[in-house]
Structures are given as C-alpha cells and as structure tokens.
C-alpha cells in the first residue's frame, strides 16, 4: 500500500480510516505473521472491497467505530488470504492486482463520489439544523 495515498483523491469522499489506515495496519500484522507478498496483495484487495462504500462525513467520535470495523474486516481478510480465499475480479471494482484495484477505487472516488458526497452531506446537516 506504499502508493495508496498518492492514488486517492485529495481529501477523498470515502473514509480514510476504513480504506487506508486499517488495511495498512493489517498488512503489517500479515507481514509479521509471515504471509507472502501475494497473500498480502490478496488481503488488501479483499479489504478494499469490504469498505469501499464508507463515506467520510467529517471527523467525530464514531470514526473510532469505523476504524474498528475496518480493522476487524481487514484482519478477517488476512485470515482468508492465508487460506487462499480472496475477493476476485468478478466482484465489482476489485482486480487481482492491488495497484489496479486502487486505481479503480480512485476512479470511483474521483468520477462518481467527488464533490457529490460533500454536497449531499451539507444538505443533510442543514436539514438537521446543526448549522445555520
């Protein structure tokens, strides 16, 4: 994942805790457990599929819950990869190669979600009268 952060949209509409931090932490655990580079690739691809739709709606205490869910999912993906199980290229935007999976996620963020998520969240916050 050394190239993941430069591939994402600047200030991505998806939760960075869920799509970057947790999978990266789990990759470190996987490395320490002796998983091969291919198994770590498989684990990270599966982890990206699990959390790709989680949007960022601002930093707040509930982000810790998102981080926990993402880390648990990433560690589950590690256990799956250890057994040769992974998300495959017939399951949405995931590809067999992590770099291509991240490029696909970038396209999803940039072409579909970028700016739209902020506008929708702004409307929701105004409707809830949290801001004036």
Residue ranges and their predicted role:
Residues 1-2, 48:
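Residue-level detector of secondary-structure transition/capping positions
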Residues 10-21, 66:
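Active-site nucleophile and cofactor-binding loops and adjacent substrate-binding regions
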Residues 22, 29-132:
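Functionally critical mobile loop/hinge segments
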Residues 4, 28-29:
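Alpha-helical transmembrane segments of multipass membrane proteins
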Residues 2-12, 55-60:
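Glycine/charged-rich beta-loop-alpha catalytic/anionic-binding loops adjacent to active sites
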């Amino acid at each position: 994942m050394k190239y993941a952060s430069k591939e994402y949209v600047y200030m991505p509409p998806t939760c960075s805790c869920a799509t970057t931090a947790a999978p990266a932490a789990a990759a470190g655990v996987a490395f320490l457990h002796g998983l091969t580079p291919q198994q770590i690739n498989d684990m990270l691809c599966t982890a990206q599929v699990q959390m790709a739709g989680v949007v960022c709606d601002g930093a707040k205490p509930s982000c810790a819950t998102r981080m926990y869910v993402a880390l648990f999912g990433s560690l589950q993906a590690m256990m799956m990869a250890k057994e040769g199980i992974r998300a495959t290229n017939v399951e949405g935007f995931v590809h067999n190669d992590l770099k291509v999976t991240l490029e696909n996620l970038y396209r999803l963020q940039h072409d579909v979600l970028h700016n739209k998520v902020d506008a929708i969240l702004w409307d929701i916050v105004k409707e809830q009268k949290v801001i004036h």
